[in-house]
Curated annotation (Swiss-Prot):
Belongs to the DnaJ family. Residues 5-69 form the J domain. CXXCXGXG motif repeats lie at residues 150-157, 167-174, 189-196, 203-210. It comes from the Bacteria. This is Chaperone protein DnaJ. Homodimer. Keywords: Chaperone, Cytoplasm, DNA replication, Metal-binding, Repeat, Stress response, Zinc, Zinc-finger. The gene is dnaJ. It is found in: Cytoplasm. One of its GO terms (cellular component) is cytoplasm. Zn(2+) 2 binds at residues 167, 170, 189, 192. Transmembrane segments: none annotated. Participates actively in the response to hyperosmotic and heat shock by preventing the aggregation of stress-denatured proteins and by disaggregating proteins, also in an autonomous, DnaK-independent fashion. Unfolded proteins bind initially to DnaJ; upon interaction with the DnaJ-bound protein, DnaK hydrolyzes its bound ATP, resulting in the formation of a stable complex. GrpE releases ADP from DnaK; ATP binding to DnaK triggers the release of the substrate protein, thus completing the reaction cycle.
Amino acid sequence: MMSQNYYQILGVSKTASQADLKKAYLKLAKQYHPDTTDAKDAEKKFKEINAAYDVLKDEQKRAAYDRLGHDAFQNQQSRGGGGNHGGFHPDINDIFGDFFSDFMGGSRRSSRPTSAKVRGSDLKYNLTINLEEAFHGIEKNISFSSAVKCDTCHGSGSEKGETVTTCDACSGVGVTRMQQGFFTIEQACHKCQGNGHIIKKPCKKCHGMGRYHKQRNLSVNIPAGVENGTRIRHTGEGEAGIRGGNSGDLYVDIAIKPHDIYKVDGAHLHCKLPISFVNAALGGEIEVPVIEGGKVKLTIPAGTQNGDQLRLRNKGMSKMRSTIRGDMLTHMHVEVPKNLSKRQRELLEEFKKESINEKENDGSFFNKMKSLWS
């Protein structure tokens, strides 16, 4: 096998990428590792595979190998004391760990000690406000139950003055390993429950957790222009972490109550405006309530029809992080009086006589009827 060059040993082309080299190496290493096969020449082939990969995975060595050729590179390595792999065997667990990670989507646990600190959970709070509060923005006080950092042990979980020791069963790793053939199975350490350390004297107030539950009060700022369904994040205001871990976040979900007058359409507001049939016919000026409080004057054009829409610009909702406002759209609702005085009836009868095109049997009346459907 060693009569072949390193590319041939790994079964790849000279233009192979590092990913292709690693893939080929892992496949051959799995096949020829002495721990996985009883083949007579397995150890020899395994050494050759490692020798080839050791050179080709290093860009500088690979460049020299390509420039000098196999024999010249070997001679230079021998003179320089390189290229001697002796009886070195990479750990089969490392090979299989890489193999499963690359080809089966697995992951490998680091052998370094893990921290016992655990981040706290995020919390969600549903807050209902009215439309005026959404327009102006408001500071709201909310109350909720949450895990908070223990003020006795300051989150360590240990009694004051007591030290936290590394677990001797797992050496601080948090897991123990069990050999099954040539596979290694990891499981959470039974002694420290995967924490990697032992608290000999747990804090009495928090029972070693570094936190405890209590009712919290928090002031939250709701910005002007917030919309229904907006989620506001308050970093670090969620549950306290376990044994000094970082706190989670608090998410406040905003719901806006329906308004008695206005209907919301994005940043625009819609409202129905009752006007008399006299104002609709003659035109006029009326006062309209606006969301910020107070009233503004609205001019009604003569001949306004029921359902006509008039726009008040920049009188809608405010927008978050913007000075621009939406509009208010008023929908005319022409009111016809039900109870007329004698004088009102006389005037209307006179108006009726003076009206033109009022005959209900002429063509213009039926044309008007048809136009209402268009």
